[in-house]
Amino acid sequence: VGSEMCIRDRLDSLAAKFETEDFIKDDPIQFLHRFNDKGKEDAELAGFIASLFAYGNRKMFISKLNDLFARADNDIANYVKNGDFANLKGMEYRFAKDYDIIPVFEILNKLYSSSKGLEELFSYAFKSENFLQTVVDYFYSNAPKTAEHGFYHMIPNPANGGAMKRMNMYLRWMVRSSEVDLGIWKFMQPKDLLIPLDVHVARVSRSMGLLNRKSNDFKAVLELTEKLREFCPEDPVKYDFAMFAFGVELNKEKLGV
């Protein structure tokens, strides 16, 4: 128990140190803050779209997102609702080509035409038996028959057992309220969130003895989130910042910085 207390204290201090406004400028959450002044729909759409591209090299995907939002005249809610996505032709990032990206926008257009949009979809799904699967199934049921790997990489299927890192990160942005996270969705509480698990968070968690599972999959997400709930039941995902910070510090030690 003593060593667990030490770990918790270390995580708490790292989380407090890194979860500050200064974190925003180099993180994809910058797009939610940029669009939040325009309104809730703009922030939730900017966040959802940013989360789809948030993998690989951070500088690269942030630059790609700047390009994408510029094509949308930095008016993302109106752009989605207007439904003319011709100027996304030629847009691509790693696995996603324009013929993968445009269908996502077309589905979002349909969602906002027929409902209150992403908040309504996610809140409806949250009440269902299988939260993330219900969200994803909406996109799959409206996907073109020609949808290819790039589309399914942007919106992965939870049934495959993956960590669903980007969707859990999006939920962190939208549900937690802090200097960094917006907290504009109220249908769920921070205690309901799951840790966004990537290779860095997984490596740090294992090195601290918080995660035993060897695969970085959904079962690992549940195991680690349960452990973090022991430290902070009402807000386990705040430790995402601590894990990130710890990973950065470990790298510095390796590099001798």
Map each language-model feature to its residues.
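Short, small-residue-biased leader/transition segments that mark boundaries at the very start
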Residues: 1-6
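Charged interaction scaffolds used for protein-protein
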Residues: 8-252, 257
